[in-house]
Regions:
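Surface-exposed binding patches on compact interaction domains or structured appendages
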Residues: 26-27, 54-110
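Terminal connector regions
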Residues: 113-163, 243-272
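Short edge beta-strand/loop segments characteristic of extracellular beta-sandwich folds
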Residues: 44-48, 188-196, 236
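Short, hydrophobic/aromatic beta-strand segments
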Residues: 53-61, 69-72, 121-122, 173-174, ...
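Short aromatic-acidic-glycine turn motif
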Residues: 63-87, 134-138, 209-220, 258-260
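Short, solvent-exposed loop/turn segments enriched in Ser/Thr/Gly
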Residues: 38-44, 106-108, 119-126, 185-189
Length: 272
């Protein structure tokens, strides 16, 4: 007897910290890409179906952690520490399931309720927006040797961090071990973003002349969360743009998180 098994392949847009004002995967667009909220506050996220057919999206709150390479990994709620899982009890959201017509958008409301006894600090969970697959659109099953047919249906999803700050957590950023290299004809900047304190840092990384104002290369939306003391960043550099400028170079990290007050960290970097 031939059997058919439907398997879902989840394609989630959360591997790296977001670098745009909108996060997108498939026909799903979410804005903003991050929320920072205080105790007993509220916010909203706009979900937009950019496709040409009606789609249903499920919304859930999940745990994620950052690695020193900047990737975002899933955390099992059952094994998470009490401190890491605390945000799940602080954050509320509605609705939890929406159906959008083509080019239609809807607002998801986010709320925070912090108990008076909650210790100060930064707490974080991630909102996962995931398209519900249409069974009718599933790929035709491919027959296997044992007579079982398997069909893979991609499920597109986007995650955004929801950061809750209780009290006034502090944080600071600095740069270390900056170096430029050329491999296979491609220039690349490597640098370690160092983070201190109990608050995440977030901003823009720039390579520029030591006395200049125009960046040679830029990457926006760089975050380092409290679980990492440092994050390694790799920034591709256009060799033509690099050759057009002379003199010493520097790397600059400009914090765009309002809590940082526009703090700037700089370090020199030698030419390759």
């Amino acid at each position: 007897m031939k059997r058919t098994m439907m398997m879902a392949a989840i394609v989630a847009s959360h591997a790296l910290a977001p670098t745009m004002a909108q996060a997108a995967a498939g026909d799903l667009l979410v804005a903003p890409t991050r929320l920072i909220m205080g105790a007993n506050s509220g916010g909203e996220v706009v979900v937009n179906n950019t496709g040409d057919k009606a789609t249903t999206y499920r919304i859930s709150l999940v745990l994620r952690k950052m690695t020193e390479q900047g990737t975002i990994e899933s955390v099992d709620e059952a094994t998470a520490s009490q401190r890491d899982a605390a945000a799940l009890d602080l954050i509320t959201y509605a609705p939890r399931k929406i159906t959008l017509a083509p080019q239609q958008s809807q607002t998801v409301r986010i709320g925070v309720r912090v108990p008076p006894t909650m210790p100060g600090g930064e707490y974080r969970a991630h909102l996962l927006f995931r398209a519900v697959p249409d069974v009718a659109d599933a790929a035709a099953p491919q027959p296997a040797a044992d007579g079982m047919s398997i069909s893979l249906t991609p499920i597109y999803g986007v995650t955004i961090p929801v950061i809750v700050r209780v009290g006034e957590p502090t944080g600071s950023a600095s740069l270390n071990n900056a170096r430029l290299s050329v491999q296979d004809g491609q220039a690349q900047l490597d640098v370690d973003l160092m983070r201190a304190g109990d608050r995440s840092v977030y901003g823009t990384l720039e390579l520029m002349q030591a006395d200049g104002k125009t960046p040679i290369a830029t990457i926006k939306g760089i975050a380092a969360y409290p679980e990492v003391a440092q994050r390694h960043i790799m920034l591709p550099v256009d060799r033509t743009a690099l050759a057009r400028v002379s003199g010493p170079l520097k790397v600059r990290f400009v914090e765009t998180d309002p809590a940082a007050g526009g703090a700037v960290s700089e370090t020199a970097v030698a030419r390759p």
